[in-house]
């Protein structure tokens, strides 16, 4: 089976659904952000602060292309879709899943999360604007799942059905 790439905005459920899908399909799951942190020896927040977003996006593209393209679930960072080369790579090397969640619901989920470098608690409008700027890229995915106010079980049932179509 080709790789399954899980995309979506921060807080949409990529990591949670990736882990659940991994158990269900008996496939390994790899998180691009975690792999970048391991390779760079620092957390993403520090990469953004010390090297900037452009450096992080370069690490992200390099990491994406270094991962297996068969029998693995890859959970991605929310901004991986910003680079056309990344979108092309994922579409050519696997099935791309877009987890959509209403950005206002995400903002509520992330209100107290200090590990998200692009989430500004005080500026929900900027958060929604960033989401909307990426939306067309996310929608290039093969499979779309709306996770808004759904349980993991509901999302998994819908995702399994669409993967098997």
UniProtKB/Swiss-Prot annotation:
Pfam families: SKI (PF01202)
A cellular-component GO term for this protein: cytosol
Keyword Acetylation in record: no
Main subcellular localisation: cytoplasm
Enzyme class: transferase
Annotated pathway: Metabolic intermediate biosynthesis; chorismate biosynthesis; chorismate from D-erythrose 4-phosphate and phosphoenolpyruvate: step 5/7
GO MF, any single term: ATP binding
Organism superkingdom: Bacteria
Residues annotated as binding substrate: 33, 57, 78, 134
Binding site for Mg(2+): 15
EC number: 2.7.1.71
Coiled-coil intervals, chain numbering: none
UniProt entry keywords in alphabetical sequence: Amino-acid biosynthesis, Aromatic amino acid biosynthesis, ATP-binding, Cytoplasm, Kinase, Magnesium, Metal-binding, Nucleotide-binding, Transferase
Cofactor binding note from Swiss-Prot or TrEMBL: Binds 1 Mg(2+) ion per subunit.
Native species: Bacillus anthracis (strain CDC 684 / NRRL 3495)
Known role: Catalyzes the specific phosphorylation of the 3-hydroxyl group of shikimic acid using ATP as a cosubstrate.
Protein name: Shikimate kinase
Gene3D superfamilies according to UniProt: P-loop containing nucleotide triphosphate hydrolases (3.40.50.300)
Reactions performed catalytically: shikimate + ATP = 3-phosphoshikimate + ADP + H(+)
Subunit structure, as described in the record: Monomer.
